[in-house]
Amino acid sequence: MIVLEGIDGAGKATQANLLKEKFEKAGKQVSMYSYPDYSSVYGERIKSFLYKKITLNVEELFFLYLIDMIKDKKRMMEDIHSGKYLIVDRFFFSTIAYQSAGGFDYSRAKQIIKLIDLPVPYKIFYINVPVEVSMQRKEKQKGKMDVDKFESNKAFLSKVSEFYKKLKNERFYSESWEEIDGTQNIELINDLIVKNINLV
């Protein structure tokens, strides 16, 4: 199970797709997961919040993001036990980072995660990009009017970055955290990830 983390515009989805190609080329079976899952009822609510259609408090948001992942827990475990390689574009680490930045208690968030007992990733790659780069990429990708309320908030994204760094430095939930400079060339980033995984 490989988890890709980072703020908006870090390049997680790009790396997830490149990684999938390389795994499949190496003859591995792959399952892809991405959160929030906008195809789920929980993901739909999250999307409505992000585009300011509904209002949710920080506790509602924390548990909504979490339930969106918990719904897949059984399927994830089945995939792992069947020998599939899981590539996850954001996991509960992002929920902790984003909702702690929004005011949810950081220590409490970590305690709740431990109680839920979601799968432990083999590797967590934190793709680190400056907030300015994140915002530029998102505006270019979506257009200035289509960025969501998190993607357009510089002060908020800076706080999220700090919580990501905290999680990485604490080695929360797994010893296998790796930080990668997300401003590098896309292929170079992918090569670094693949080398770190020891994909044969």
Place the predicted regions along the sequence by residue.
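Walker A (P-loop) ATP-phosphate-binding motif of ABC ATPase nucleotide-binding domains
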Residues: M1
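Hydrophobic positions on the alpha1 helix immediately C-terminal to the Walker A/P-loop
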Residues: Q15
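Conserved lysine of the Walker
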Residues: K12
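P-loop (Walker A) phosphate-binding loop of NTP-binding proteins
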Residues: I7
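NTP-dependent small-molecule kinase module
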Residues: K20, E132-V200
